[in-house]
Amino acid sequence: MKRIITVLFAALFCLCAQTYAQNRADELMKQAQESLAKKEYIKARYLFLQAYNSFASQEKYTQAVECGVNASALYHRENYYKEAFELLRNAEQLIGNGEQKLKKNL
């Protein structure tokens, strides 16, 4: 009985953590867009990058690529070309890995 309760608590914790992570990524993306509208480019870039990493870890490829492209554009805007292209290469690799994992084109 004690083992069953422990397993149920662990499952509930994992479910709550996943929901929190999903909401967190969406919130980061929203904050990044708001910062971009306010022309706070460095803050927006940082938030888009955090959202990209969060979506990538959740395997939400569409949102991850969108955030990655936005962060890359902000890197490029401030003449950080190496970082911009590195982020785009990582996004392309993420898509390739996702295609292999899902066995379909994204």
How would you describe each model-predicted region?
Residues 26-27, 66, 105-106:
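Residue register of alpha-helical TPR repeats
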Residues 49-54, 89-97:
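Amphipathic alpha-helical segments of tetratricopeptide repeats
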